[in-house]
């Protein structure tokens, strides 16, 4: 396996895991409040049934949520984003100087939630029509910054120990 592939997969999984754990810890401070996982799971599950856009996801009929598929999609997105980050960096072996860039990249991925996911859930751009509008917007920003921090930690500390690049 190539260093690029390993960095994409391992970096994506670890950055997503870091985001998931850190966001739970941040949530207890009251700074953020996640949309209920069942709501996001409902939207993801509807994707598997061919429906992307909802008037309001909360009002859409209940559907059996396939959490293993939802989890796989969640981590798959994390891997794909880590691959995009790696490609932007021409990342064979991550560099310690990419720390700030990784956090910035994580923040930049917020546009996916603000301009794709929230509007598709019927919550408007940046969640401005969703439940607890600004809290939802801030939560997305914080969570994606945490994903970027996970990428930064991977690239600065773990990848150099675990992946040998062909020089």
Give residue ranges: language-model regions:
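Juxtamembrane/disordered regions of integral membrane proteins
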Residues: 1-167
């Amino acid at each position: 396996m190539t260093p690029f592939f390993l960095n994409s997969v391992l970096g994506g999984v670890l950055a997503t895991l870091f985001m998931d754990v850190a966001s739970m810890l941040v949530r207890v401070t009251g700074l953020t409040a996640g949309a209920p996982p069942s709501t996001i799971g409902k939207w993801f599950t509807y994707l598997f049934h061919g429906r992307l856009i909802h008037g309001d996801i909360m009002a859409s009929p209940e559907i059996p949520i396939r959490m293993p598929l939802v989890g796989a999609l969640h981590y798959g997105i994390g891997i794909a984003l880590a691959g995009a980050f790696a490609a932007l960096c021409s990342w064979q072996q991550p560099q310690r100087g990419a720390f700030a860039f990784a956090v910035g990249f994580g923040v930049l991925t917020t546009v996916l939630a603000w301009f794709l996911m929230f509007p598709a859930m019927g919550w408007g751009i940046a969640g401005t029509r969703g439940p607890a509008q600004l809290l939802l917007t801030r939560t997305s920003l914080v969570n994606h910054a945490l994903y970027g921090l996970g990428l930064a930690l991977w690239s600065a500390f773990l990848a150099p120990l675990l992946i040998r690049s062909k020089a």
